[in-house]
């Protein structure tokens, strides 16, 4: 069992039940999934960029990403419907907890001038999104094998009903929010 999952079951559930006066254990918010997305507009001109992005994403997430395609054509961007423009991974269960643990304890502290993550990334329903400017913060990525610095979006989907519950859950898991 992943370390964060154990922490959640043993310590966080009773703590959240006390803090929010839940009567039933099923009311306690929990992590549902983590979606990692890398959008690559440059893939329109050079499809080879997508291959390196897919391999890097597989190293970061620990599972093979799916290639995302354009939903509609946009002439201004020279984009046609169905063209590959990025990749995404959805993590659930053990891999989700292991990724979040690595993100909180290893990757985020490696960000330059890191003072904590913004508390404004919540969507109103308890889900949190954050952007990472470069994939080099992940220890799985070898600096010498990088051809281009790419950013990625990480969305943490919780079963929380509002932002307050979602933030409390993530804060107790160790997410370093800015005050």
Curated annotation (Swiss-Prot):
Disulfide bonds: none annotated. The keyword Electron transport does not apply. Pfam families: Ribosomal_L5, Ribosomal_L5_C. Keywords: Ribonucleoprotein, Ribosomal protein, RNA-binding, rRNA-binding, tRNA-binding. One of its GO terms (cellular component) is ribonucleoprotein complex. It comes from Geotalea daltonii (strain DSM 22248 / JCM 15807 / FRC-32). This is one of the proteins that bind and probably mediate the attachment of the 5S RNA into the large ribosomal subunit, where it forms part of the central protuberance. In the 70S ribosome it contacts protein S13 of the 30S subunit (bridge B1b), connecting the 2 subunits; this bridge is implicated in subunit movement. Contacts the P site tRNA; the 5S rRNA and some of its associated proteins might help stabilize positioning of ribosome-bound tRNAs. GO terms for biological process: translation. Belongs to the universal ribosomal protein uL5 family. It comes from the Bacteria. GO terms for molecular function: rRNA binding; structural constituent of ribosome; tRNA binding. This is Large ribosomal subunit protein uL5. Part of the 50S ribosomal subunit; part of the 5S rRNA/L5/L18/L25 subcomplex. Contacts the 5S rRNA and the P site tRNA. Forms a bridge to the 30S subunit in the 70S ribosome. HAMAP family: Ribosomal_uL5_B. InterPro entries: Ribosomal_uL5 (IPR002132), Ribosomal_uL5_bac-type (IPR020930), Ribosomal_uL5_C (IPR031309), Ribosomal_uL5_CS (IPR020929), Ribosomal_uL5_dom_sf (IPR022803), Ribosomal_uL5_N (IPR031310). The gene is rplE. PROSITE patterns: RIBOSOMAL_L5.
């Amino acid at each position: 069992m992943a370390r964060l999952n154990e922490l959640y079951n043993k310590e966080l559930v009773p703590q959240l039940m006390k803090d929010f006066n839940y009567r039933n254990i099923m009311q306690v918010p929990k992590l549902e999934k983590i979606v990692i997305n890398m959008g690559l507009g440059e893939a329109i001109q050079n499809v080879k960029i997508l291959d390196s992005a897919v391999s890097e994403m597989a190293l970061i997430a620990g599972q093979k990403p799916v290639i995302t395609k354009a939903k509609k054509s946009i002439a201004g961007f020279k984009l046609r419907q169905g063209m590959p423009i990025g990749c995404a991974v959805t993590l659930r269960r053990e891999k989700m907890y292991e990724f979040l643990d690595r993100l909180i304890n290893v990757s985020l502290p490696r960000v330059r001038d890191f003072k904590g993550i913004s508390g404004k990334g919540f969507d109103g329903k308890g889900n949190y999104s954050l952007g990472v400017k470069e994939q080099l913060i992940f220890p799985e990525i070898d600096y010498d094998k990088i051809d281009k610095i790419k950013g990625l979006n990480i969305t943490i989907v919780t079963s929380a009903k509002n932002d307050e519950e979602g933030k409390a859950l993530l804060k107790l898991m160790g997410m370093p929010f800015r005050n």
